[in-house]
């Protein structure tokens, strides 16, 4: 097995303390000064990349599936979930980027140094499970694409996905940037199709605006669909990924350099997620308008009743005519493959950060994909396309329930003076992010408990079987609650931000509560060579 172990264990002291002894500090500091003299737009372009790579996760097959079903089942009533979800995603993605810029380490590495061994292993397993859960919609979406393009059974397409992404990763050495550009363009081809269809079906603007700004959960399954939407939008592994991707950029370690880096990554993420918001709104609106049309044929009405990725190409007939299925299939294939690449990198950084293990990308992809294929293959054989579509919703709900175990550490670390120094979150960001975070966590816990209790009451199992199931599941629910509370109330014990005395007086004067924490304006942010092989333009 091709595994590389890092030669030494990282200490708990930040890179700013160790960099002071670097023999090349003066040379790198001069490079920093040259970087800071460049025009702002050039420095911004140097930071472009991580946000757009992360935003691909908001256009993956899981998002498309939940968007299509939300529109078909509830028209525009759940658009507010997408709006709140992407606003929250922008906040936490920017916090993840800030964490990487300020500390020079990504979220998984900081979790490893902060938590006890048992907790660290627990968080690592949950993070790996999140990557696998995120990969399931990509496996099924790609299988649906093969079914649409080549008319092969879905379960055969699931097997093919085990090698398709490996081939794509292998082709990167022949032109990574061109390959990524091609994939992105194919994904946006589908976006353009939905925008074109949107201009034809013309959904009522008033209803769309009401759906965006008036929260409603009417009708059967609205709560489950809303949680699935959140799970598809706010993915735990994306937080690990974004905090690592920013380390591939050479950000000067001066006060201005750090602030500029955080600001540039915020602008880039904001633009990328705004585009993702528009695309998600377009998909929901097209689905809601087309499936509620008075002129809908009986065949299309039957498809709307059980809408899934493999039956949605008819929504684009007005734009593409007979070729709608082919274009939709190609775009769906691109969506699944591009999202899988980001998932592969996220899994690599999670393993490297928690365990200090670096695995070859093809091996990492093979491991994740093999595990993700198993449930997809079983469900597609037994339940066919309909069962596979339901599995996507279940995977999205799993992601939503796993969110606290990446979100709470991120919120605590980015708000901690010992981790971020004077760059920690403002009180407004702390209050708003914790409010939304705890709200989502509370909704998930409420839905989990009420859904399970309702299932126990109304299922057809014998009473003794219900007792056994309840006795097995309720302890896990208790462990879930205890784990969330533990992560929330536990105090940070490891300092990752070490001040330099040369600027302590300045920072103390500007910020009375900064204590002895300051920013070393002379030491360069270490370029992470171990994270530099990311396929992004520099």
Swiss-Prot record:
GO cellular component, one term: plasma membrane
GO biological process, one term: iron ion transmembrane transport
UniProt family annotation: Belongs to the NRAMP (TC 2.A.55) family.
InterPro entries: NRAMP_fam
Pfam families linked to this entry: Nramp (PF01566)
Keywords noted in UniProt: Ion transport, Iron, Iron transport, Membrane, Transmembrane, Transmembrane helix, Transport
One function term, GO molecular function aspect: manganese ion transmembrane transporter activity
Membrane topology field: Multi-pass membrane protein
Gene that produces this protein: NRAMP5
Described function: Probable metal transporter.
UniProt region (Disordered), positions on chain: 518-538
Subcellular location: Membrane
TM region(s), chain numbering: 44-64, 77-97, 118-138, 140-160, 181-201, 227-247, 264-284, 324-346, 365-385, 391-411, 427-447, 467-487
Name listed for the protein in its UniProt record: Metal transporter Nramp5
């Amino acid at each position: 097995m091709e595994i590389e172990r890092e030669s030494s264990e990282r200490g708990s002291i930040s890179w700013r303390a160790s960099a002071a002894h670097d023999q090349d500090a003066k040379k790198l500091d001069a490079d920093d000064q040259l970087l800071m003299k460049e025009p702002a737009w050039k420095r911004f372009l140097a930071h472009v990349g991580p946000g757009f790579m992360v935003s691909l996760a908001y256009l993956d097959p899981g998002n498309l599936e939940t968007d299509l079903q939300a529109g078909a089942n509830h028209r525009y009533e759940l658009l507010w979930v997408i709006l709140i979800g992407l606003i929250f995603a922008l906040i936490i993605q920017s916090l993840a980027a800030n964490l990487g810029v300020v500390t020079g380490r990504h979220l998984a590495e900081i979790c490893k140094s902060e938590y006890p061994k048992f907790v660290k292993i627990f968080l690592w397993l949950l993070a790996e499970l999140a990557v696998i859960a995120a990969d399931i919609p990509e496996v099924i979406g790609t299988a649906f694409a093969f079914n649409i393009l080549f008319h092969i059974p879905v379960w055969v397409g699931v097997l093919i996905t085990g090698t398709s992404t490996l081939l794509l990763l292998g082709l990167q050495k022949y032109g990574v940037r061109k390959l990524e550009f091609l994939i992105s363009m194919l994904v946006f081809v589908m976006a353009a199709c939905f925008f074109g269809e949107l201009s034809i079906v013309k959904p009522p603007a008033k209803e769309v605006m009401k759906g965006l700004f008036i929260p409603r959960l009417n009708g059967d399954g609205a709560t489950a669909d809303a949680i699935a939407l959140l799970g598809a939008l706010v993915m735990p592994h994306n937080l690990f990924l974004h905090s690592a991707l920013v380390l591939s950029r050479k950000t000067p370690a001066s006060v201005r350099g750090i602030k500029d880096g955080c600001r540039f990554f915020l602008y880039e993420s904001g633009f990328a997620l705004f585009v993702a918001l528009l695309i998600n709104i377009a998909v929901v609106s097209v689905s809601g308008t087309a499936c509620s049309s008075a002129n809908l044929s009986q065949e299309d009405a039957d498809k709307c009743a059980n809408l899934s990725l493999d039956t949605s190409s008819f929504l684009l007939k007005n734009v593409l005519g007979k070729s709608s299925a082919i274009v939709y299939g190609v775009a769906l294939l691109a969506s699944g493959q591009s999202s899988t690449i980001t998932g592969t990198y996220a899994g690599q950084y999670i393993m490297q950060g928690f365990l200090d293990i670096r695995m070859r990308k093809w091996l990492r992809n093979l491991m994740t994909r093999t595990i993700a294929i198993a449930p997809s293959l079983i469900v597609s054989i037994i339940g066919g396309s309909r069962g596979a579509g339901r599995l996507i919703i279940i995977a999205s709900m799993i992601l939503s329930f796993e969110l606290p175990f990446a979100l709470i550490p991120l919120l605590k670390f980015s708000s901690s003076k010992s981790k971020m120094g004077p760059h920690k979150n403002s009180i407004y960001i702390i209050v708003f992010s914790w409010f939304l975070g705890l709200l989502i966590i509370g909704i998930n816990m409420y839905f989990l408990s009420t859904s399970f209790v309702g299932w126990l009451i109304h299922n057809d199992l014998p009473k003794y079987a219900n007792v056994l199931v309840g006795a097995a599941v309720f302890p896990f629910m208790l462990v879930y609650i205890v784990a969330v509370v533990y992560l929330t109330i536990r105090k940070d014990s490891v300092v990752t931000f070490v001040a330099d005395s040369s600027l302590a007086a300045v920072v103390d004067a500007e910020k009375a509560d900064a204590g002895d924490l300051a920013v070393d304006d002379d030491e360069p942010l270490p370029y992470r060579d171990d994270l530099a092989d990311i396929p992004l333009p520099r």
